[in-house]
Amino acid sequence: ALNAPKSSIMPLVHTMTARNFIYMQKDTLRYRIGVATYSVGVAYNNRKTSLQFIQQEMNNITALSNETCQLGIQSRTMVLYIAKKDSPQPIRLMSSVGKQLPLYCTGLGRALLAYKSEEEIRSLFPEVLTAYTPHTIATINDLLKELELTRQRGYAVEHEETNLMVNCIAVSLDYNNAPIAALSISIPTFRISESKEKEAVQILWEAKQRIETHFKMYGVDFGN
């Protein structure tokens, strides 16, 4: 039993009754679990963790695009790859979960960086950036310009900046108005085209909307 006076408990009981979390049986004058409590319990038991839901969406992204889909989160100045769905194509991106690459030269990283302030960006990186290929952005000023384009487009792009012959289109996954992860489609150069990139953006945006709706309904849970 609750160790509290009846005068303190009754307002709570009235509120829970009004909202159908409990109800009183007229014959016994005892309170029972109401339909709202039952609904909450069913929703909890049927929920998927955020990661499970995102992985389901990643399967769909790969099925629609025929390309590799990856999920990443920020780890200081790096993007940490936490999930991947391989392309069914014989020639595809070779990468692995657990790998880390710099935020500044990856599509996933730029999607995560795009809505940070210039001050935050400058605190993360030196003026001159390490080049991984001849196409890698070379300076922090160039990065800031690219992030402005990312904000205008609503998605990030990266063309052969970490691996030659590999291109990436990415969107952020936002919760409470801040990016908490990013989702990408990776496409080999010999398969990419303007129409292919446009298709990838559409697929990613539709997945982004579903995932962010899930976040709003259930919160963010990357648990097991």
Where are these regions (language model features)?
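Conserved acidic, metal-coordinating active-site core of Asp-based
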Residues: 132
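Extended hydrophobic
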Residues: 135-210
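A cytosolic small-molecule/anion-sensing beta-strand core signal
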Residues: 26, 35, 75, 175, ...
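A structural signal for short hydrophobic beta-strand segments in well-ordered beta-sheet cores
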Residues: 22-24, 71-72, 173
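Amphipathic alpha-helical regulatory segments at dimerization interfaces
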Residues: 1, 53-64, 153, 210, ...
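N-terminal helix-turn-helix
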Residues: 1-52, 213
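Cysteine/selenocysteine-centered motifs that mediate thiol-based redox chemistry or coordinate metal-sulfur cofactors
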Residues: 120-125, 208-224
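Amphipathic alpha-helical effector-binding/dimerization core
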Residues: 32-127
